[in-house]
Amino acid sequence: MRTAERKESMNIAFLLQPKSDTAFLYDDFTLRQGLEKMRHHGYTAIPVIDREGKYITTISEGDFLWFILRDSEEGDLQEVPLQNLEKTQIKDIIHQDKNPPVPITATTDELVERGMEQNFIPVVDDWGSFIGIITRRNLLERFAKYKD
């Protein structure tokens, strides 16, 4: 790896919000647990990981809403069986292709591309374990600093 590439890769670590400071859901959480955590943090989307710490996907409010609508009888929200929020796990409603992660070795160019499409970018280590996120805000702040 050339020196310039190595510097670019290392720079993304400075943007990383570590897993310990990031809200996430486990894929075996119930829908109720997921919704409560999202409401508590005020998020509209949140990373999902398995119990081994591997990043799976990102789940959004829309994923919950579409499940509830599909689960209701003929789309009538007054007929939604709320007990299904207690029985259904996150892994039963997720779509694996949302917000793909980047490796910690990703370049800033890759981050910019992803940041244009995603509010946050999940970051994984060499083994696919979730290590944190880079928010669009952090990315923009970093570039604003270097603009001057």
Please place each PLM-identified region on the residue numbering.
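Tandem CBS (Cystathionine beta-synthase) repeat/Bateman regulatory domains
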Residues: 1-148
